[in-house]
Regions:
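Helical subdomain adjoining the active site within ATP-dependent kinase catalytic cores
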Residues: 141-179
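Catalytic activation segment of kinase domains across protein kinase-like and atypical kinase folds
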Residues: 48-88
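Transmembrane helix-bundle signature of multi-pass membrane transporters/permeases
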Residues: 68, 130-134
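Active-site activation/catalytic loop segments of kinase-like enzymes and analogous catalytic loops
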Residues: 73-117, 133-152
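All-alpha amphipathic helical-bundle segments outside canonical DNA-binding/catalytic cores
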Residues: 119-131
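ATP-dependent phospho-/nucleotidyl transfer catalytic cores
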Residues: 1-42, 47-55, 133, 151-156, ...
Length: 179
């Protein structure tokens, strides 16, 4: 299925994502583990869904239509995916994609300050996996949309979703180097 010409042009990304199937296996093991609990989650904690005051202090998360039961991985993973890189998923220059390790530490410290007592040790041990999983998932979603002729996310230009997928693949690679 999918657009064959686009498939040929996205071969490198397809092969990379297939090579990362261990992420899916780790996700499956996580959700089946007795210490992985479901709780209320936002499921879209990207930086553009955080409301800041005039001093740039975070006030609250907005866009609440995605709130439902889920695993902490969804919220933490999207925070890591969108906060640790200085550029967004829209960035065309892949050389600008890198991981700010101090942001990873700040997210972990801040999250654990408020939530550590709510997480099992098993969940705490999967904190960084959450970023890896969400980067992988978002790359896969952008690539799937590109291969299916941009029916979900839409596009501003012909290769928009391919570029978004490439962006997230690059971020995932950078993140994995830092694990």
């Amino acid at each position: 299925k999918g657009n064959q010409a686009r498939k040929a042009g996205a071969k490198e990304e397809i092969l990379f994502l297939i090579s990362q199937k261990n992420i899916v296996e780790r996700w499956q093991n996580f959700i089946e583990h007795k210490e992985a609990g479901k709780r209320v989650a936002h499921h879209d904690t990207k930086i553009s869904n955080v409301l800041f005051d005039e001093t740039e202090k975070g006030i609250c998360v907005i866009d609440l239509d995605t709130v439902m039961p889920g695993f902490f991985i969804s919220d933490v993973g999207d925070m890591l995916r969108t906060y640790i890189c200085p550029v967004s998923e829209e960035e065309k220059d892949l050389d600008k994609i890198f991981v700010r390790n101090e942001f990873i530490q700040a997210i972990q410290d801040g999250y654990f300050t408020e939530m550590k007592q709510c997480l099992s040790q098993f969940e705490q041990d999967h904190f960084l996996f959450s970023g890896e999983f969400l980067m992988y998932m978002q790359a896969l979603r952008f690539l799937t949309d590109y291969l299916n002729n941009d029916i979900y996310y839409g596009k501003k230009y012909e290769t928009h979703n391919l570029l978004r997928a490439q962006n997230q693949v690059q971020l995932l690679k950078e993140f994995q180097v830092n694990l």
